[in-house]
Amino acid sequence: EFRRVLFRSCYAVMVMLLSKSFLISISVAKDVINGVADFMAAILPVLVTMIALAGGVTQAATIDPIVMAAVVIIPRIYVTVIIPLIMVGFVLQFANNLSEEHKIDNLCKLLKQWTVWIQGIIITSFIALLTIRGITSTTIDAVALKTTKFAVDNFIPIVGKAFSDAITSVAGYSLIIKNAISGIGLMVIILIILYPIIKMVLMTFIYKMSAALVEPISDKRITSTIAATGDSLVLLLSCVLSVSLMFFVLLAIMASAGKFIVGG
């Protein structure tokens, strides 16, 4: 009985220490996700305007509602649904390792699977929808731009050729500006996520290494709890990386928009 009381006392202290560091990691993950989302909300209207000026009116019209909805809704899903699921799983691991008789392993695994599945569904749906609509609208814009240039060149007397060249010049310069803004956007996202990701990777490594080192000399429940904390940090890290990946792909697609202009 004394051994059980002593274990639970040590376990309670360990839980408090692990919870403190895990809450810090949650705060870091939320700040990064919200920071990237705020930056995308600021830069996207500029990029959409440049796409429209470069002749990609259909692309701008179709991408804009998808993009703005994604920038608002996806980070909110991560912050209000996925991260709380990770937190619940983290807490349940403590309860699971408190007793040797009564276990909830399957419930913990189920929550972990839900977290991974939701992220996978969001990433796949977002990238597939964005790619399909981008390809379709690119074809429409290419035909529309060539038709406009042909009509101006052939049906406006004397100055038609000059107007046609002016349209191409404005579209080309808009394309250059858009590509520069997209490149800057990619670099800013890297700067936003770099330090937090390094911090979370190091914390995960510390917990995994700690679990490996104390395993020969400690109760298996303590080892399991420390390892589970590392697993929860991996899930948090996946949230930050998946949101960043989606916005990376978004900027890359927008950077490639309007390339049909080059060469007339």
Predicted regions and their residues:
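Pore-lining transmembrane helices
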Residues: 10-20, 24-264
